[in-house]
Regions:
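Generic beta-sheet signal
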Residues: 78-79, 170-178
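Active-site-proximal alpha-helix that buttresses catalytic centers in soluble enzyme cores
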Residues: 4-150, 156-159, 167, 183-185, ...
Length: 230
């Protein structure tokens, strides 16, 4: 056997046969396998790094997020989208008074949400709501007042961000009682992955730089109790 030759003799006694496997024939594929394996690891990592970051949860000890929300609210820089509370036609719970509206048990949730916004301050806030019953009822129990209803808070697949900015008054926060589709439309407009928001969730958008609004984060209805504002 020549020097340096890496042959492995595999002798098979079965039927008296002897076979030889030359490992050199596999060496040519080794580099290709290494490159392929590396690519399989690198490509998903690259896609993950380049994908838009998820919208931050402002609750559960997110001190920096809570501080940014409080500061932005005090300056009248915020747009907040509030999803209506539990809708009756998608629930087995008792309706408040209209099947197209909210459930009876959701009334307390809306009142509680309103109290949270009262703590933030409503003197420098403007309120708009979708004209659908579930949104008007939510707004009514949150703020003891209801707007006439704006169609752009229902049909929100196009120009939703532009419409929101057009209704935002400098130095005043804008509260929009709307629907999950509109919240997702806002995320899409700001190039963020869409989220599945629960009933009564609030999505906050900072307009500190009016030409470059950014999603600050969200708070689910049940998570306000964990919020700590500086």
């Amino acid at each position: 056997m020549p020097s340096g030759r890496l042959d492995v003799e595999l002798r098979l006694s079965l039927f008296g046969l002897t076979r030889s496997i030359d490992t050199r024939r596999f060496a040519r594929y080794r580099n290709a396998v290494v490159v392929l394996a590396s690519a399989l690891l690198v490509i998903p990592l690259t896609l993950w790094l380049l994908s838009p970051a998820a919208v931050p949860d402002l609750a559960h000890g997110n001190i920096a997020g809570a501080r940014a929300l409080a500061d932005g609210w005090a300056k009248g820089e915020m747009i907040v989208l509030v999803r209506h509370v539990e809708r009756c036609d998608h629930s087995k719970a008792a309706c408040l008074n209209d099947r197209e509206g909210i459930t009876d048990r959701a009334r307390a949730v809306a009142v509680g949400l309103g109290a949270r916004f009262e703590q933030l301050g409503l003197d420098n806030a403007d309120l708009y709501n979708s004209p659908l019953v579930r949104a008007t009822q939510t707004a009514g129990y949150m703020f003891n007042k209801v707007g006439s209803g704006d169609d752009w808070l229902i049909n929100c697949r196009h120009d939703f961000l532009r419409n929101a900015l057009a209704h935002k008054v400098a130095g005043r926060n804008l509260i929009l009682v709307t629907h999950s589709e509109c919240m997702q439309a806002m995320e899409t407009a700001l190039q963020r992955p869409t989220s599945a928001f629960g009933y009564g969730a609030s999505l906050f958008v900072s307009t500190a730089q009016p030409q470059a609004p950014r999603l600050l984060g969200f708070i689910e209805a049940s998570d306000w109790r964990s919020m700590t504002f500086p």
